[in-house]
Amino acid sequence: MRSFLLASLASVATLKSAQAHPAHSTRGLSKRGIDLDSYRLKQPVSYTNANDVGSDASISSLTRRATAEETASELVKKVVPGATFRVADNYVGSNGVAHVYFKQTANGLDVDNGDFNVNVGRDGTVFSFGNSFYTGDIPTAPSKSKRDTIEPAAAFKSAVSVLDLPVSAGSATSEPKEAENTFAIKQSEGTVSEPEARLVYVQTNGKLALTWRVETDVLSNWLLTYVDAIDGSQVHAVVDYSADASYQVYPWGINDPTEGERTIVVDPFDKQASEFGWHSDGSKTYDTTRGNNGVAQNNWANKSASEYLNLPRPVSTDLKFHYPYSLNETDFQKYSNASVTQLFYTSNVYHDLLHKLGFNEQAGNFEINNNGAGGAGNDFVFLNAQDGSDFNNANFATPPDGQAARMRMYMWNGTTPFRDCSFDASVIIHEYTHGLSNRLTGGPANSNCLNVLESGGMGEGWSDFYAIATHLKAGDTRETDYPMAPWVSGKPNGIRNYLYSTDINVNPQTYIYVDPQTRVHPIGNIWAGMLYEVLWNLIDKHGKNDAGTPDFDSNGLPTDGKYLAMKIVMEGMALQPCNPNFVSARDAIVDADKILTGGDNKCEIWKGFAKRGLGKDAKYDRVARTESYDLPEGVCA
């Protein structure tokens, strides 16, 4: 493997904390007066944890079948008798647990928000499962002899009109695609890729509505809009693959320019996670910031996705990406190559770290060539530095496995000179973690599983949590408080409502603080605060590894509390149901520890959640949550 020198903007070993868009973020459609939060899906979701499965004789005694998929199918038939469904995805995690994902169908059409995930243990028995299947009356099938629905092009026009999309749709027509009941939308302008309409059902207000699922990528928002297929006048729900954020960066372990100096790092790639290195996809080697995991470039000109591969990026025939950068430079385009290099470096380091922790090809990670390791492939990340489409933010769009993701890093103009968030590792980590949480929750093939308000907020929380965890310093203790994005925002206390702290006087937020929230970032601040408590409980028990990568025991588990917490939380994402809430996600994390360690850390995990009101009797209600500060009997015995 050819070696190369990479000038990272410090020694990128410990990414900092924040990432997510600030509370004052101006998201694409928000600037047009459209509140996408009001269109979020609201279907009920349940999660049956390992303890509940074990205490239910009818489930625990379920006969093991020849394969995990067959065992999981029998469970679905038992839990939801009479339901029709298809296998949407499945894989076996690095811990031996099989994850099988089902999509509900009705009259031969998908129920787009009807999901059932079954986690099958290494012994072949059901470990836990999540369920959002519809159980009401199935409507009469639409007529095949005559169309009872509006035309797909009309649904597209309705979506454009209702959401005030920056798209020209007046001349739009539709053409059938190979997939049944799926149409390509032609003769429109303003989208990144060709729009598509597919006939599906969606659960809404306790019923199934027949809808056209209209897919439109308008760059700032990559949308699935569910337009009523009968009258075309109502939009039942909207899913947005994009997740916004904004923050700072330099070398792994240096979060931003306030923490250290730039240095040259030689061959930093992990040979197992990136077997082709960072500048090859296994079939071709590149002399620029392009490889199997991502391609980084400058997009100040705000070019569309079809032009990404032609955007300017640094070129070095000897792979020495060494470029000047000055904090005093007012013309940020003069250090464009340094910005692109930093973004490429930090994203690749994080890709490799997540791979070591279990976010691999089968689980839906981001690579062009999966090299026979499973998963869909063809989906690295487009990494746009100094993106010209916005200021004071960052953005990550996560389509399903097999489609390339997109990260856009903006300039921040709250200081003089402006600050470039590609030099803030916490922003990059926050954004990339949106890809992690979206690919794991509900399975790699389903990117619609963090779109209810609470689960969407938790997505922001996971992104903050991983940014904070990777930022911890050698001298930090549980008394150390962390802001989100203080450097890039120019605000010492960062951009969240409260610092991340185990001190209830510094951060008083508990479970009921979620009740009045109507936006995802305040909810994420609460969820990440709970995870911060769990993190320090595990560090106090197992110690803290301050190296850039974890050490593993003979069972493949991190030996320290920091990386173990990251591993357990990641495993919880894979276990939890599509669109979880705080309670079901907590249960999935407890279950994750049970899978990984046999429950060795249940006391520390429960104490962390119970301290913030998410104890054993906490109950979810959309407007009136019930707090609990009690521990389950015997967990700390």
Curated annotation (Swiss-Prot):
Range of residues in the leader sequence: 1-20
UniProt induction comment: Expression is controlled by the prtT transcription factor.
A single MF term (Gene Ontology): zinc ion binding
Subcellular location: Secreted
EC number(s) given by UniProt: 3.4.24.-
Active-site residues annotated for this sequence: 431
Function of the protein: Secreted metalloproteinase that allows assimilation of proteinaceous substrates.
Record-given protein name: Extracellular metalloproteinase 2
The species this protein was found in: Phaeosphaeria nodorum (strain SN15 / ATCC MYA-4574 / FGSC 10173)
Phylogenetic placement of the source organism: Eukaryota, Fungi, Dikarya, Ascomycota, Pezizomycotina
